[in-house]
């Protein structure tokens, strides 16, 4: 139920004056809001991850007022940094590297985050089948020459589609090469020398070999290829990517522009100057947010965006997504020798890739006795394809399998997961058939409708460097022009 005075009229009044008399409550969706519970801004950003924080800072720097609504207790989303309490050394559980582009360097300079070239700690890799703990004698093991040739050939194919460097902007009809399984694409053009490196840089996409090619190209754009083949990635100089979001919190917090532990429960999105209205449940009670524009910077899975007043077209498109599970645990007492990296492989699969769901890799960190363990699942319609407890149990089982099958190489210990981060739902994607039917053209056509803009990994890829570029070039100009 709405009050006798329409919500539209109230909203127009609010946008004009940004003040409601304290003794005259505004009733929206059956709730009464007094002035102290009404927040008026130019833009509301739903989602305080990498994309939401970035666009909020950009908007504030452009002189626009903004408020970020974040469901969790912190900003940063997929970014998570483990700090050892004894040594204060750190290890990343999410965002690790950046591209050396102006979109990255300008933004992080603005936040006073120094960057440095990446350096790799020496480690020795061993291949084991973590289903059994037994060693794997790889049958697929490309030479350095094959690796270089694979990426050179891939770059030549990628150059046919320069628009992919800006987003999933596809020619129509969509070429068959872009919708065929990625493994078949690499084989067709004799690019398999690059396959293992591509797989190891992009866990969490589900079945790597059967992904539609363009879904992998979203990640493997020209900047990523250049960084991987030259090793010229950047990292935060203090080895703490979470510091970015501490700084963002300071920037936005100075203008009371962040609502943590807060969740949208109701939204009204309209065309024209009426703008948008959101009811948000916060630790201090429900707040009414009134703004000219809305930015949605959370995964557009239906169970996530249901309260955001979706149109029929949005429901139809977002309902087509599948995603994969991607998980990172910090583990000690592994029994693995120091500076030893364990890659999960299989003797009986194409390219010796592991059978998912499974651990992908166990990577030694700069913290003595602590390994970062990465796990992933196959694609699923479910937003959380693999339950956290099941993933954790599989990590412990995998380590114990190594110990049992190789008592001469691994100490018999009781592994302990000391930090945990789930990145699910990860790498939202669609089928080849949906790509052929124009899914991405329809998706991008949503930008700006009903005073709403979108950014985040689904609109680009799980790579902050590329998300920030996409936001700077494809979202912000139109958004700012409408304010």
From Swiss-Prot:
Signal peptide boundaries: 1-21
Single biological process term from Gene Ontology: terpenoid biosynthetic process
Names of the cofactor(s): FAD
Protein function: FAD-dependent oxidoreductase; part of the gene cluster that mediates the biosynthesis of the sesterterpenes ophiobolins, fungal phytotoxins with potential anti-cancer activities. The first step of the pathway is performed by the sesterterpene synthase oblA that possesses both prenyl transferase and terpene cyclase activity, converting isopentenyl diphosphate and dimethylallyl diphosphate into geranylfarnesyl diphosphate (GFPP) and further converting GFPP into ophiobolin F, respectively. Other sesterterpenoids (C(25) terpenoids) are found as minor products of oblA.
Pathway the protein contributes to: Secondary metabolite biosynthesis; terpenoid biosynthesis
Coiled-coil features, chain-numbered ranges: none
Protein name: FAD-dependent oxidoreductase oblC
One Pfam assignment: Amino_oxidase
GO MF: oxidoreductase activity
């Amino acid at each position: 139920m709405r009050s006798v005075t329409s919500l539209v009229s109230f909203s127009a009044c609010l946008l004009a004056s940004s003040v409601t008399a304290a003794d005259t409550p505004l009733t929206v969706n059956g709730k009464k809001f007094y002035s102290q519970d009404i927040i008026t801004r130019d833009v509301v950003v739903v989602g305080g991850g990498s994309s939401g924080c970035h666009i909020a800072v950009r908007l504030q720097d452009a002189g626009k007022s903004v408020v970020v609504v974040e469901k969790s207790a912190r900003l940063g989303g997929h970014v998570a940094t483990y700090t050892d309490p004894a040594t204060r050394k750190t290890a990343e559980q999410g965002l690790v590297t950046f591209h050396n582009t102006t979109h990255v360097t300008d933004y992080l300079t603005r936040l006073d985050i120094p960057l440095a070239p990446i350096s790799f700690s020496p480690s020795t890799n061993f291949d084991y089948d973590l289903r059994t703990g037994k060693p794997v004698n790889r049958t697929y093991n490309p030479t350095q020459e094959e690796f270089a040739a694979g990426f050179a050939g891939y770059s030549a194919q990628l150059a046919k589609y320069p628009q992919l460097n800006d987003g999933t902007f596809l020619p129509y009809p969509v070429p068959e090469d872009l919708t065929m399984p990625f493994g078949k694409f690499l084989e067709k053009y004799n690019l398999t020398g690059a396959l293992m490196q591509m797989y190891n840089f992009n866990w969490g996409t589900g079945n790597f070999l059967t992904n539609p090619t363009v879904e992998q190209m979203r990640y493997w754009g020209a900047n990523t290829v250049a960084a991987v083949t030259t090793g010229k990635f950047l990292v935060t100089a203090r080895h703490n990517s979470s510091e970015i979001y501490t700084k963002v919190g300071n920037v936005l917090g100075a203008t009371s522009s962040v609502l943590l532990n807060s969740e949208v429960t109701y939204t009204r999105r309209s065309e024209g100057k009426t703008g948008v209205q959101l009811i948000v449940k916060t630790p201090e009670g429900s707040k009414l947010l009134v703004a000219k524009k809305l930015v949605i910077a959370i995964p557009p899975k239906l169970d996530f965006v249901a309260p955001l007043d979706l149109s029929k077209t949005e429901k139809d498109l977002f309902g087509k997504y599948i995603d994969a599970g991607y998980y990172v645990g910090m583990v000690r007492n592994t029994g693995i020798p120091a500076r030893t990296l364990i890659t999960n492989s299989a003797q009986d699969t194409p390219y010796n890739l592991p059978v998912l769901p499974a651990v992908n890799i166990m990577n030694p960190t700069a913290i003595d006795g602590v390994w970062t363990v990465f796990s992933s699942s196959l694609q699923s319609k479910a937003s959380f394809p693999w339950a956290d407890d099941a993933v954790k149990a599989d990590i412990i089982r995998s380590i114990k399998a190594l110990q049992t099958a190789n008592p001469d190489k691994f100490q018999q210990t009781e592994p302990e997961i000391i930090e945990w981060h789930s990145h699910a739902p990860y790498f939202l994607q669609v089928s080849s058939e949906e790509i052929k039917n124009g899914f991405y053209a329809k998706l991008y056509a949503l930008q700006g409708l009903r005073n709403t803009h979108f950014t985040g990994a689904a609109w680009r890829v799980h790579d902050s460097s590329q998300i920030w570029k996409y936001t700077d070039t494809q979202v912000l100009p139109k958004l700012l022009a409408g304010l």
